[in-house]
Amino acid sequence: MEKESEIQSLPPTRRYTISLALPISSLNVAYNLQLKTSFVWKISRIVSLYGIDEIILLEDPEYVQNTQVHTLSSDAYLKDPTKFLTDLLCYFETPFFMRKELFPLNPHLKYTSCFPLLPLRNDKASTVNIEFPYREGIVTHPSPQAKNKYIINAGLSHNVIVSSPSVLAPRTRVTVRLKAQSPNEEGQLQGDIVSFSAPREKGGHYWGYKVRSCLSSQLCKSSPYKGGYDFVVQINSQTSAITSKELEASLPSSFRHAVLVLQDNVVQKELVDSTAKSISFNPFPVSFLNDPIPEEILLAAMTRLSDMLLMHGRR
């Protein structure tokens, strides 16, 4: 009860970030397209439920080469696991109304319609929420009435018109902040383009995740955040189990950018070359006869870590 009251008293903003480093070899748990799609959806759902802001696909050149050589499928994307994972992770995160514009039909998207939409943002709402006026949208075309104005489809009953000093190409995805006013004479709402992180930083609302890839040895060096990652959690189901009290004691007093590294045999060969605070823990209290699969490891880890990260993240 004491921890719940502490969490409820936290300010309604969130400047810290949580990233997940996922080895592309994790895709080995599934042996056909339908199961691979199911695996990616499960990862996407766990990531969205626990407010993870970034997914980093860790590449191992030897694994990629072996996959390309031994994959017999006619689908070229299955020969490139990084491309396959990136496409599906981004597809599941993208609002439904803009998927057709951003993702042309491809064989590897065949089974994506079998899975429910992720519980993200306010994508399903068709009206403006005055208390939280952010929306994801897609550029449709420049406004014919004014220079540097663009029409945005934000999944609402009215389009949104925004200003931009730089050129916005059609089908560009943007985050907009709607202004509190009625539609203009053309039936358009007015808004401003803001950063993807604005809803999280200003209002504390989880707004989805970004996806990037890098070599496993370049994980911390390639961080997109200023100052890089300052807290690294290596999740390894092969290490000794620790209690929740021991786990919380090992966390830093505060952090800005945490990265959770989901380990497997490939990643364990690479050293995380960083000065960041680093811990390694086994999310399971007991050992298993069979190794748990990646989504089980991630879910178990977030079950134990989520409240602790919430308490220690800088706001």
Swiss-Prot record:
Top-level division of the source organism's lineage: Eukaryota
Enzyme class, first EC level, given as a word: transferase
InterPro entries: Alpha/beta_knot_MTases, NA-bd_OB-fold, Put_MeTrfase-C9orf114-like, tRNA_m1G_MTases_N
EC number(s) per entry: 2.1.1.-
Molecular function terms, GO-annotated: RNA methyltransferase activity
Keyword line: Cytoplasm, Methyltransferase, Nucleus, Transferase
Entry's Gene Ontology cellular component terms: cytosol; nucleolus; nucleus
Subcellular location: Cytoplasm; Nucleus
Subcellular location, principal: cytoplasm
GO biological process: methylation
Family: Belongs to the class IV-like SAM-binding methyltransferase superfamily.
Name the record gives this protein: Putative methyltransferase SPBC8D2.16c
